[in-house]
UniProtKB/Swiss-Prot annotation:
Taxonomy, superkingdom: Eukaryota
Disulfide-linked positions: 56-62
Species for this entry: Conus victoriae (Queen Victoria cone)
Chief place of localization: secreted
Designated name of the protein: Contryphan-Vc2
């Protein structure tokens, strides 16, 4: 029974080490990054993106 307990503890330690090494992909630089500007063309592009998101039915604008 003692050998089984030791084997279980070693397996748990190896798994936890593997999880710590692999991580979740969240790098410290990602947390502090400035959000990317999705609308570099300015206000009109923001408006057009909003119309596209709400499935604009105005043909001259949304095409």
């Amino acid at each position: 029974m003692g050998k089984l307990t030791i084997l279980f503890l070693v397996a748990a330690a190896l798994l936890s080490t593997q999880v710590m090494v692999q991580g979740d992909g969240d790098q410290p630089a990602d947390r502090d990054a400035v959000p990317r500007d999705d609308n570099p063309a300015g206000t009109i592009e923001k408006f057009m993106n909003l119309l596209r998101q709400v499935r604009c039915r105005w043909t001259p604008v949304c095409g």
